[in-house]
Amino acid sequence: MIRFLGAAFAAALLLPVASAETVQLAAADGVKVFGEVWRASGAKPPIILAFHQAGSSSAEYAPIAPRLAQAGFTVLAIDQRSGNGAFDGTNRTAAELGRKATYEQALPDLEAALAWAKANSHGAPVVVWGSSYSAALVFLLAARHPGDVNGVVAFSPGEYLANKTAVRDAARKVDVPVYIDQASGADEVGQSAAILEAVKSTDKQQLLSPSNSTHGSSTLRADTNPAGAEAHWTAVLKFLKRFMPS
């Protein structure tokens, strides 16, 4: 599959990857949001904003973001206020906040990341990428900021919010390319399909997962999905190539 990625995209795979740098953002309600940035080489690389699943942090993307950066994308992965220490990480935002937060209450953190992307993209495309509950929130984010989001990647989205139609309602306003992946269980596949059907854009796709898959973005991690991660990588990189400069 890699032979179809195109010359510019394939060349980006050979570029060196910088180490992650820590950033601090300010949400609209004053909450301090911590994150890590992996910067791609080259002029005006597209940006991926990577959001984690429940009980997690930016550490979910520690083995994922460097590969995306090597493929030519600058990646910002944040610690949302709704999260914890999965994947051997520490959620600095939640720790400093000092109280539990609902999934919906994390939306300002995603908006802070989007504001960072607007200030740093220099006109390059911005892709919002969610995992589990944040895969639900990225549809709300894209619906609220239609001029600022160029693509949506959602791993294991579902109607996880208090309003059980909120994600589909938002998806009906999303008119940018959308990619959905999920674990192979019937419930996850069904929830993903319902959300994808609601998406306004006609440029949308769902990976009907192979048997080797795990929940959320962790399906790309070799430590959690050793037998299946590469199949998911092939599919998502093929989708992402449209955002690379020609």
Q: What positions do the PLM features span?
A:
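Serine-hydrolase catalytic machinery in alpha/beta-hydrolase-like enzymes
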Residues: 24-39, 44-120, 215-218
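Primarily recognizes the serine-hydrolase "nucleophile elbow" in alpha/beta-hydrolase
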Residues: 113-173
